[in-house]
Amino acid sequence: MIKLLYPQFWQERNIIAYLLLPISLIYQFLSYLRTSLACPVILPAKVICVGNCSVGGTGKTQIVIYLAKLLKAKNVSFVIITKAYGSNIKSTTIIQKWHTALEVGDEGIMLAKYGTAIAAKHIKDILPLINELKPDVIIVDDFLQNPYLHKDFTIVSVDSQRLFGNRFLIPAGPLRQNPKQVLDAADLIFLVSSNQDQIPNELTPYIDKVINAQIVPSNNIDKTKNYFAFSGIGNPQRFFLTLENYRLNIVGHKTFPDHYNYLQADLENLYSLAKEHNAILITTRKDYVKFNYLNNKIICLDVELSINNPDLLNEKIFKKA
């Protein structure tokens, strides 16, 4: 799997974006063809799909965790389906405590703490396990662009800082799909940000289904220490902004590609940088799950989702779910 950082031309158009535009048109045609020919699988439970229309982190994982907690509180049986990005998974697997991030993906390890989670590469392989588990609801993480799965309820996550970037499709831009098409079909839109004050113009036509959400720290970290931050997630800028808002003393940071599998050389380099700055290494939960054997040497910033309109979410979810 090719792992890319979010390039600047995905946010602001330049000559590179325009040079890549012909490939984006091919991508658009192939996506249309794939969707047109697909016959969606209807699973024997209500499917809540959490996705986005762009590449990079938009807070999907935190939304899935929020939904899992909500359904559990309401005594609704559910399972979570994750694509297991960054893993070497060969077959559909129910994630267990002994699994590693390399086996089932970093997101899989995180999500399994909140309910039964299945790591799957292909929709067709999920059905036997669903028939065995018999959940009332299936939360699907990042299958929005998959035309082979029927969705009963769709939540679209939008990062309020990046929004839709330069509005070009991959690879000229960050978009997987036309935003209007995605937003028109969505049941709910989560506008995810560390600082929110108003709805962007692009989302005002959908204001009745927009939920403002913040990703906020949920654990206590010593603010008298120096920290060197690193991450291998889709939107590292949000992580660094969260650290800044938490008023931690960040003396430096390093970014890796999304779902990055760290090498020993990477760790040695990070230790060296931290020592140079008399600092402690700090990272995201998604990265932290890859370092179980080093947890005493690395600090994790835990976060959770805080939303401004839980009543709207409850009304929509339990009306359909």
Curated annotation (Swiss-Prot):
E.C. designation(s): 2.7.1.130
EC top class, as a word: transferase
Xref: InterPro entries: LpxK, P-loop_NTPase
Pathway in which this enzyme or protein is active: Glycolipid biosynthesis; lipid IV(A) biosynthesis; lipid IV(A) from (3R)-3-hydroxytetradecanoyl-[acyl-carrier-protein] and UDP-N-acetyl-alpha-D-glucosamine: step 6/6
Pfam families: LpxK
Manganese recorded as keyword: no
GO biological process terms, semicolon-separated: lipid A biosynthetic process; lipopolysaccharide core region biosynthetic process
Keywords: ATP-binding, Kinase, Lipid A biosynthesis, Lipid biosynthesis, Lipid metabolism, Nucleotide-binding, Transferase
MF GO annotations: ATP binding; tetraacyldisaccharide 4'-kinase activity
Chemical reaction(s) catalysed: a lipid A disaccharide + ATP = a lipid IVA + ADP + H(+)
Residues the entry annotates as binding ATP: S54, V55, G56, G57, T58, G59, K60, T61
Disulfide pairings: none
Entry superkingdom: Bacteria
Gene Ontology terms: cellular component: plasma membrane
Function recorded in the entry: Transfers the gamma-phosphate of ATP to the 4'-position of a tetraacyldisaccharide 1-phosphate intermediate (termed DS-1-P) to form tetraacyldisaccharide 1,4'-bis-phosphate (lipid IVA).
HAMAP family: LpxK
Entry's family note: Belongs to the LpxK family.
Alphabetized PANTHER family for the sequence: TETRAACYLDISACCHARIDE 4'-KINASE (PTHR42724), TETRAACYLDISACCHARIDE 4'-KINASE, MITOCHONDRIAL-RELATED (PTHR42724:SF1)
Protein name: Tetraacyldisaccharide 4'-kinase
Lineage, broadest ranks: Bacteria, Pseudomonadati, Pseudomonadota, Alphaproteobacteria, Rickettsiales
Gene: lpxK
